[in-house]
Every structure is written in structure tokens, then in C-alpha cells.
Design a protein with these regions (language model features):
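Short catalytic micro-motifs in class I SAM-dependent methyltransferases
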Residues: 23-27
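Class I (Rossmann-like) S-adenosyl-L-methionine-dependent methyltransferase catalytic domain
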Residues: 1-11, 35, 49-134
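Short N-terminal helix/helix-N-cap motif within the alpha/beta-hydrolase-1
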Residues: 29-33
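A short glycine-rich, Lys/Arg-flanked "PGG" loop and its adjoining helix->strand segment in the class I
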Residues: 34-46
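A conserved beta-strand element that flanks and buttresses the S-adenosyl-L-methionine
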Residues: 20
């Protein structure tokens, strides 16, 4: 079992060709997130790919967030259909991912915002980062 905000070092006996981190990394405090990114780099074979998504400030969660704390997370409180309290690391623009995901070499920066015909709360915008271990 992985403890919250813990190292993943030593969990795997073999290296990998791809790491897929979809809608999960933005809950990790910045210091630990950077540590995990370095561990991802170590876990990948040369030529291995990291696919990751991060929540953007265009996402409706940001409009419910408080000031960013020293650990890089902002408290988010949502009431209504979604009733939750989260702590999220928001990304301002896609280019910010290049610095965050160093030492990976960037292959692709993009974004997505799932279509929601009913638009319950607002945008679900996320940024996409794809990088390679050289």
C-alpha cells in the first residue's frame, strides 16, 4: 500500500516503457510531486514515455479554490451536486508543464475539456504533458 505523498522508489523490480498518470498528480504537494517525477524518470527505460495530465486554472474547481499554499496546493471546496473538499495544484498555462516535468524532454503539450451538454458546473479543463526519457 502506498501512503499519501510517499516515494514510489523500490515499489517496482523492473523498469517501464510508459507511465500513465491521468488526473492524479495534481493532488500531490509540489515537493513530493517533483520527487515523484524524478522517480518516474528513473523507472523508465531510455526512450520511455510519460503521459500526465494536470488540472488547469480554467477548470471550474479553480473558481472554488483558496489562495495557493507554500506546498503548491490550493484548498477547493465545492457544494451542490459535487460535495467535496480537495487540495489541488493548478497549472496556469501548458508551457508551465515543461519546467514541472524536468528532466523529461517534451514531446507534446496539449489540453482537453470534455464535452458536457448539460454544463453542470463549468469547464473540466486539463493540460496534457507527454515527455520522453532520453
Amino acid at each position: 500500500i502506498i501512503e499519501p505523498n510517499s516515494s514510489i522508489k523500490g515499489l517496482f523490480d523492473e523498469n517501464m516503457d510508459i507511465i500513465f498518470a491521468n488526473q492524479s498528480l495534481y493532488y500531490i504537494p509540489l515537493k513530493e510531486l517533483k520527487q515523484n517525477i524524478l522517480e518516474f524518470y528513473e523507472l523508465l527505460n531510455t526512450g520511455g514515455i510519460l503521459f500526465a495530465t494536470m488540472m488547469s486554472k480554467k477548470n471550474y474547481y479553480f473558481s472554488h479554490s483558496q489562495k495557493e499554499e507554500k506546498n503548491g496546493l490550493s484548498k477547493v471546496e465545492i457544494n451542490g451536486r459535487l460535495n467535496e473538499t480537495s487540495f489541488i495544484h493548478f497549472i496556469d498555462k501548458a508551457e508551465d508543464l515543461e519546467n514541472l516535468f524536468q528532466p523529461f524532454e517534451t514531446l507534446f503539450l496539449g489540453d482537453y475539456d470534455p464535452i458536457n451538454f448539460y454544463n453542470f458546473e463549468g469547464s473540466a479543463h486539463h493540460y496534457i504533458y507527454i515527455g520522453i526519457k532520453k
